[in-house]
Amino acid sequence: SETEAAEVEIEEEVFHKLSADEIFQMIVQLPVGYRTVFNLAEMEHMKHSEIALALNISEGTSKSQLSKAKKLLQKSLQAKGIEYEHRKSK
């Protein structure tokens, strides 16, 4: 979709401005719960229902932790002078 295409362009722009190590360091600095959910959702492309089952948490907790992880990463990007707002995917 058009929204997904725009999101990919924004994400690619962020990756071009930061090294892989900088991105890794930002993710590593997340609290462990947020980092785990972020990695499963964004890197492993798991659904919240799958994450909830795997981690023995509720889907609501999974969604909340992912949202909070993204907000913390956004703050880290802003601290580096990169404006980025992650759009919710449907």
Residue ranges of model-derived segments:
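Short amphipathic alpha-helical boundary/capping segments
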Residues: E22-P31
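Helix-turn-helix DNA-binding motif, specifically the short coil turn and the N-cap/start of the second
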Residues: K47, N56-T61
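A short pre-motif secondary-structure segment
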Residues: V37-A41
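C-terminal edge and immediately downstream basic/flexible tail or linker adjoining helix-turn-helix-like DNA-binding
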Residues: L53-A54, K70-K90
